[in-house]
Every structure is written in C-alpha cells, then in structure tokens.
Amino acid sequence: MGFTILGTGSALPERSVSNDELSEFLDTSDEWIFTRTGIKSRHVCTTESLDDLAVAASERALQVSGIDASQLDLIVCSTTTGDHLVPAEACAVAERLGAACPAFDVSAACAGFVFALDV
C-alpha cells in the first residue's frame, strides 16, 4: 500500500526572536549562537497554538493539492510539543478541517517526520 503527497503547506508563528534579542536576557550573543548553529532567529508562539499552525499548514496543503478535506484518507501529526495529550493533535486538526478520516499522532522527536511517513 502506497501513498502520494499531492501538496505541502507550512505555517510559522507571527513573532520572531533574533539572537540579539535573546542576548538581552541570556548570557549569549548573536555571534556565539550563529557560529555554532547557523541560526539568526527563531519563531515563537505567543497567541498561536500548535493546532492553529497545523490547520493553517494543512489548509495550504489542501489548496495546493486541489482536494477537499473530505477526500483525506488519514491525518498523521508528528510533534513532541503538542498543546494537549488528549485528544491527539491530529484529531483536533481533522475536526477543524472538517475531515472524517482517521487521525493520530506520532511522537519521535527529530525523526518523527520520517516515522510518520513510514506509517
């Protein structure tokens, strides 16, 4: 049994925190962080929930793919930083999208995406 990815979507929280901003309250600097990680800034949730971001990304993926949420066969969410343990993030996303398919979460840290695809 195989699957096809017809579209992808992404969403980021509105607030971005620079390394310089971090250095105002942490003993660090932009140079120290950037030379070790390559990171200049990161997005942080202030008002958005994981569900909000997952739904926004899913809606974009559905738009790109040209299909309706009612046509989905399965929703798998991979995260280690969910808003809640129960119900699964994927179930909350399915409900907000109006999808009637099975939905569940995979928790495998950085490798989660790969394991979610392998399910």
Place the predicted regions along the sequence by residue.
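Conserved "HGTGT" condensation-loop signature of ketosynthase/thiolase-family condensing enzymes
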Residues: 1-74, 95-97
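Conserved catalytic cysteine-centered active-site region
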Residues: 36, 40-52, 79-119
